[in-house]
Amino acid sequence: GLIFENHIIKALRKIDPEAQLAHLAYHNSIEAPSCVKPEEGIFLEFAPFFRTWDQPLKNRDAVGRDGKTTHGEFLRMLEDNLKVFPAETAQVLDYWMDDSLYSGWKKPQVQVPWHRDVFLSDLETYASYGIRNITAYAIYVDDYYVKTFGDISFVDDYGQGLLNYRAK
């Protein structure tokens, strides 16, 4: 992936010298690159897709949704990636509110199993690595969701968590 991304960023920077491109550390590409170094303008986007969201990342023994990868292993992969990519430009893409995921990519969707304490703990964990940029999906949280479940307070929790978020 990084070889291809390096070619893309070189082409983009011919048009826009300030162009940025994410290296998506996700699923099969979550291990840190070891042979290829990123070109200027490539930043880390860490997306621990197979983690579990009923326990915080700091619970290193928690086993992810794949039944084998622990949160400790996800954190090790994050640490390894941060040896290649600077924390200052790194971004986390997490799935705390991704109802498409929780619903198995089928509608009608289920209610988001929101764990505010897990979310806030995860923010602290990411902050401890110096990561300043946090994003999340909220797919399937739509008009049907609001009509069916009513409570979308997790969106406010997410916003307040980010408002108060500070990288360390």
Predicted regions and their residues:
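Catalytic-core regions of glycoside hydrolase
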Residues: G1-A167
